[in-house]
């Protein structure tokens, strides 16, 4: 029985010890363990695989993906970072820039501003094309001039009161429709995601006047096209109490973990520790600093249970980004199968 439990732990758990991490390699391949049928089976995979949405709001999404290998999870993460397309500033035509920010630095800043535009409605611009069209380009104008405020108090030293337009924000960017874009996109739908991003600061007499061309691209070409601020995953924590922990030791144990992981209950007049929500733990391994407690707890992670966290830049909702990443991964698989079918067998 103990041997079977040890094998099951090696197959399904990554164990965090005091001086190292065990079972880090995937070992559930055919023939590795006697009595285990680890051969690939489509029906079994479909039965065990699931996706559970845990939390979602306007910009963030947390979901569980269960029943997959690390290679698939990491491929999915990399697609979110580098292969889901967005629209971003690619070319900046500077007509006048008398601010202290150099033209090339200003253009770089503008490129990193997330643009609220659905990239699925646009095409990639063909390489070598200089002039954009309504199907592959968005155009923005930025024209701001700083002047003195004639109504400012004489003893004021606050630039916000002394000057007009001394701070250039993304709200100053004006969309200039190309072709029939004004008919396709309602007013206010094409704009920077946030209107309070500071671009530059001016002083009286200084001016920025330029035109921006936004094109469709992917993060693999440039990070400005990446649709996510963060896209990460971690394995589901599995914390097990190997022996009862009571009294002051229970309180001490709860302090070794993230809030909410260990709860202390009153049982027959005694304080008793129990694992309440292992998911919340960050695995600081603080428990191994306490000689009396470290043997009472086993820290592990479930090998095939991935907790994904996706934070959108605001260009698209996070659930849309995830669905687009799934489509891209499916397309890669189809192309791979087509290549295999095209190979002539000897």
UniProtKB/Swiss-Prot annotation:
Q: Which GO terms describe its molecular function?
A: DNA binding; DNA-directed RNA polymerase activity; protein dimerization activity
Keyword annotations: Acetylation, Cytoplasm, DNA-directed RNA polymerase, Nucleus, Transcription
Gene3D superfamilies per the UniProt record, alphabetical: DNA-directed RNA polymerase, insert domain (2.170.120.12), RNA polymerase, RBP11-like subunit (3.30.1360.10)
- Where in the cell does this protein reside? Nucleus; Cytoplasm, Cytosol
Location of N-acetylalanine modifications: 2
SUPFAM superfamilies, sorted: Insert subdomain of RNA polymerase alpha subunit (SSF56553), RBP11-like subunits of RNA polymerase (SSF55257)
Q: What does this protein do?
A: DNA-dependent RNA polymerase catalyzes the transcription of DNA into RNA using the four ribonucleoside triphosphates as substrates. Common component of RNA polymerases I and III which synthesize ribosomal RNA precursors and short non-coding RNAs including 5S rRNA, snRNAs, tRNAs and miRNAs, respectively. POLR1C/RPAC1 is part of the polymerase core and may function as a clamp element that moves to open and close the cleft.
What's this protein's family per the entry? Belongs to the archaeal Rpo3/eukaryotic RPB3 RNA polymerase subunit family.
Q: Which protein, by its recorded name, is this?
A: DNA-directed RNA polymerases I and III subunit RPAC1
* Species per Swiss-Prot/TrEMBL record: Mus musculus
């Amino acid at each position: 029985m103990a041997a079977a439990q040890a094998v099951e732990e090696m197959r399904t758990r990554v164990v965090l010890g005091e001086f190292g991490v065990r079972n880090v390699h995937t070992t559930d391949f055919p023939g590795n363990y006697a009595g285990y049928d680890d051969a690939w089976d489509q029906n079994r995979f479909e039965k065990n695989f699931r996706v559970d949405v845990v939390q979602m709001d306007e910009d963030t999404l947390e979901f569980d993906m269960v029943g997959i290998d690390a290679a698939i999870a990491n491929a999915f993460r990399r697609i979110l970072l580098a292969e889901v397309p967005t629209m971003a500033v690619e070319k900046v035509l500077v007509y006048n820039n008398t601010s202290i920010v150099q033209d090339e630095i200003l253009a770089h800043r503008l490129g990193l501003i997330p643009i609220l535009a659905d990239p699925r409605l646009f095409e990639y611009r063909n390489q070598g094309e200089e002039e954009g069209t309504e199907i592959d380009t968005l155009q923005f104008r930025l024209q701001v001039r700083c002047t003195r405020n004639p109504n400012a108090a004489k003893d004021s030293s606050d630039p916000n009161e002394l000057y007009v337009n001394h701070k250039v924000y993304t709200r100053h960017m004006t969309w200039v429709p190309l072709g029939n874009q004004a008919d396709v996109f309602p007013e206010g739908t094409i704009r920077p995601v946030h209107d309070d991003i500071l671009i530059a600061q001016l002083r009286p007499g200084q001016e920025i006047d330029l035109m921006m061309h936004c094109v469709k691209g992917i993060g693999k070409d440039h990070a400005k096209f990446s649709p996510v601020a963060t896209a990460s995953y971690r394995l589901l924590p599995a914390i097990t109490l190997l022996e009862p922990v009571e009294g002051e030791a229970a309180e001490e144990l709860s302090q070794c973990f993230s809030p909410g992981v260990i709860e202390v209950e009153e049982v027959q007049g005694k304080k008793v520790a129990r694992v309440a929500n292992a998911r919340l733990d960050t695995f600081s391994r603080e428990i191994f600093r306490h000689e009396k407690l470290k043997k009472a707890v086993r820290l592990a992670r479930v090998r095939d249970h991935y907790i994904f966290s996706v934070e959108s830049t605001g260009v698209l909702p996070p659930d849309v980004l995830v669905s687009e990443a799934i489509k891209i991964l499916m397309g890669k698989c189809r192309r791979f199968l087509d290549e295999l079918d095209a190979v002539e067998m000897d």
